[in-house]
Amino acid sequence: MNPKDIYPDILKDIKLMQLASVRDNKPWMCNVWYVMDEDHNVYWISRETRRHSLEIKDNSHVAATMHPWFDKGLMNDPGQAMIISGQAKRLSGEECRMPYELYAERFPKLREFQSLEKFLNDEGHHYFYKITPDEIIWWDEINFPENPKQEVK
């Protein structure tokens, strides 16, 4: 069984990602609405003034996780999660076109929230950010109970 055959169906229903950034050896975690392309690059929108955005500007190393919520707790609810570490950056200009379309497909209100033209011209209140993964782990206690840590990249 290949984890790449499993997680796309699970992740399609998970819209919230936990994003970890760091500055001066002090980690920070936040939640953002995300999309992922076929190459596992991850995109989200945020203001430049948010703590995670400021930290990414100074230090591009980030980590992120996406997972279903668990109701039963330890030992009663096997876990599944995607864990990513990589480099993040703010996108500008034409770099925003493809993630805008992906994001608008998943979150249709984006078109009302901020136009593509504003992103392309770096004129909006929100900007696109991208994680290019260095490492991807699919943690799956359901399909791989003896070895839940499955390396994807």
Residue spans of the language-model regions?
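Extreme N-terminal tail/first-helix region
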Residues: M1-M17
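Short beta-strand segments
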Residues: I14-E48, I56, A63-P68, N76, ...
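Generic structural signal for secondary-structure transition and capping sites
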Residues: K15-L16, H61, P108, I136
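Residue-level detector of flexible, active-site-proximal loop/helix-junction positions
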Residues: K26, D71, E95
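Short acidic (Asp/Glu) patches
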Residues: R47-R50, T65-D71, E105-E117
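An amphipathic, aromatic/His-enriched active-site/gating alpha helix that lines ligand/cofactor pockets
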Residues: S53
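Charged, gly/pro-rich active-site loop segments
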Residues: D77-K153
